[in-house]
Each structure stands twice: as structure tokens, then as C-alpha cells.
Regions:
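Ligand-binding clefts/hinges and TM-proximal coupling segments of bilobed small-molecule sensing domains
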Residues: 31-33, 167-182, 218-220, 250-308
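Extracytoplasmic small-molecule ligand-binding "clamshell" domains
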Residues: 37-115
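A ligand-binding cleft/hinge motif common to bilobed small-molecule-binding domains
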Residues: 99-102, 116-124, 171, 192, ...
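C-terminal motif of bacterial Sec signal peptides marking the signal peptidase cleavage site
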Residues: 25-28
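Periplasmic-binding protein-like
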Residues: 57, 133-140, 203, 211-251, ...
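Extended ligand-binding regions for polar small-molecule ligands
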Residues: 30-32, 76-85, 151, 155-156, ...
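Short helix-initiation/N-cap motifs at beta->coil->alpha
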Residues: 76-77, 91-102, 144, 161, ...
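Acidic, polar ligand-binding/catalytic clefts
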Residues: 76, 84, 89-151, 219, ...
Length: 308
């Protein structure tokens, strides 16, 4: 009887073995995590974070490539510092501007930093970190041309697609001949080739271009345009715990002086608000900075002297 039962149990064991193996394999497959799931799990544990961050590589001085194709710029250095502060392992990749938010929500990467303004429309589909920079928008035209912001009706004007500058043009100057481009560089090319009469961009990027050989014959037309969407933030998927981690790291960088050091190395001042004014145009002789981390851009006073 015992032999019979043992034999029967042995047969069952032999029959169950493949099934058990299959179930173990299935369980292993179900327990395997995507890179995004790994990031989320790491965000709530002591394991090192592995974060993939996308940027646009033609938005100087925020993020662009050097002669060797290496990503450099203000945002790249800021990301390096943020990741070091979080003790995270970060990979920064280049992504076309129009693909940043779709790619983020498709889980191709975990965050996007590319001079992206925090707008109500974007906040509907992504979540932003606390602002890390503020900048207005400007109109650039050829020196000697009398083009103005108020005189854009019927005029061909360039701007990069899906930016605050292009949105401003479409909302406030829909009667102008708006030309939209996938990259800022292509907008500059059409300006210098004469295919458009003016170009509108964020202030820092536009001023940086005016300092180049290609921009030497161009100038800012009129005053800086301030909007409610001038704050830049890092974009994440909604509900991602990485938002809180990046906000904490950013606050710590501001407290320990690293943020001021990085910002100052690019914009000549440790104050983000002052940076908007300090990079403005040649002729700025003095910049008065209010020593307040929450200072508004309007609190920065620049005295300009015209060169005869």
C-alpha cells in the first residue's frame, strides 16, 4: 500500500514538475520590471536611482552639442549637479523638441529638460518641477530695419514651434505671416537668409545668438516681452515621485551655492532674475541685484547707456 502510494505520488510529481517550472517562469516574467518601474521602485528605496533625461540639443546656451557631439550647456551642468545631489545615475539623451512630451508620456525616458516653459497647456499633460530659470521673449531683426512688435501685421516672422514665443505670436499677432520651425537654428537660418524679416525667441537664447558671427548684423527690436509663462521647469509624468526628489535636490543646490555658481558661470550673475537683464544687450553698464532668492525679474534694475 505504501509502495503503491509512493508510486502514485512519484507519477504526480513527474507530471507536476513541468507545470511547476512553467509557473515559475511565468511568475518571473510577471515580476520583471520595465525601466520606468525600476525607477519608481528605486525612488521609494535606498537603491540608487537610474534616470534617463531627454533634452533638445540645439538650444544654446541651455543645451547643445560641442564639436565632438557631446551635450553641453547650462541645463546639462544643472542636471549633473542635481543627479549628484540625489546620488543618482543619470543618462542624458537628445530628443527632437516636438517629441519631448510625447516621448516622456510614452515612457521612453523619465524626465525632460529643454528650456521648457511651465504653461497651463503643458501642465494638463505633464507635471513640472519647481522653476529653475525665468526668461521673457524678444523680437530680433536686422540692424537698421524699423520693424517693431506693433508693426508685425503682414510681416514674415520666424519662431520655433511649440514655444512660448510662437504661442505669443499666434495669440497676439495672428495677422502676421508666422513661420514655425522644428529647431531654433532653422529659424536663425531663415532670418539671415532674408526669408523672414524678424524672429521671436526667448530672451536668453536670442541674445546668445546675437553674440555670434551669424548674429552680428542683428539686434533686439523694442523691449523684452514678459508673459505669465516665463518660468522654466523639468517635465515629468504626472504623479511621478521623481518630482519631489528633484525639487528637494534643486532647493539644496540653491542653499549650498551650487545653483548660483552654475547660473553665474553662464549668465554672469548668481541671480536668475538678474540673468534676464544682465545678458540683454551691449551697453548695460550696471546691474543692481536684490539679494533675495525669490526676487522678481522686475526688481532688477539695469542702467543702459547708448553707444554713439
Amino acid at each position: 500500500m505504501i509502495t503503491s502510494m509512493t508510486s502514485s505520488m512519484s507519477k504526480k510529481a513527474l507530471w507536476l514538475a513541468p507545470l511547476s517550472a512553467a509557473m515559475l517562469m511565468l511568475a518571473a516574467c510577471n515580476n520583471s520590471s520595465t525601466p520606468t518601474e525600476n525607477t519608481d521602485a528605486a525612488a521609494t528605496s535606498d537603491a540608487p536611482l537610474h534616470i534617463k533625461i531627454a533634452t533638445e540639443s540645439s538650444y544654446k546656451p541651455f543645451s547643445y552639442t560641442d564639436a565632438d557631439g557631446k551635450l553641453i550647456g547650462y541645463e546639462i551642468e544643472l542636471v549633473d549637479a542635481l543627479c549628484a545631489q540625489m546620488k543618482a545615475e543619470c543618462e542624458v539623451i537628445s530628443q527632437d523638441w516636438d517629441g519631448l512630451i510625447p516621448g516622456l508620456n510614452a515612457q521612453k525616458f523619465d524626465a525632460a529638460i529643454a528650456g521648457m516653459s511651465i504653461t497651463p497647456e503643458r501642465k494638463e499633460v505633464v507635471e513640472f518641477s519647481d522653476p529653475y530659470f525665468h526668461t521673457g521673449i524678444i523680437l530680433i531683426g536686422k540692424k537698421g530695419d524699423d520693424i517693431t512688435v506693433d508693426g508685425l501685421k503682414g510681416q514674415p516672422v520666424a519662431s520655433q514651434r511649440s514655444t512660448v514665443a510662437s504661442q505669443y505670436l499666434q495669440e497676439k499677432h495672428a495677422d502676421s505671416d508666422i513661420k514655425l520651425y522644428d529647431t531654433q537654428d532653422n529659424a536663425y537660418l531663415d532670418l539671415t537668409s532674408g526669408r523672414v524679416r524678424a524672429m521671436m525667441s526667448d530672451k536668453v537664447t536670442g541674445i546668445d545668438w546675437l553674440k555670434t558671427e551669424a548674429g552680428k548684423d542683428y539686434e533686439v527690436k523694442g523691449q523684452e516681452i514678459s508673459t505669465s509663462d516665463d518660468a522654466m521647469g523639468i517635465a515629468f509624468r504626472k504623479g511621478d515621485p521623481l518630482v519631489a526628489k528633484f525639487n528637494k535636490a534643486l532647493a539644496e543646490l540653491k542653499e549650498n551655492g551650487t545653483y548660483d555658481q552654475i547660473t553665474g558661470s553662464y549668465f554672469g550673475t548668481s541671480s536668475t532674475a538678474a540673468a534676464q537683464q544682465a545678458v540683454a544687450t551691449e551697453g548695460v553698464k550696471e546691474v543692481v541685484v536684490v539679494d533675495d532668492g525669490n526676487v522678481d525679474a522686475n526688481a532688477v534694475i539695469a542702467k543702459e547707456e547708448q553707444t554713439e
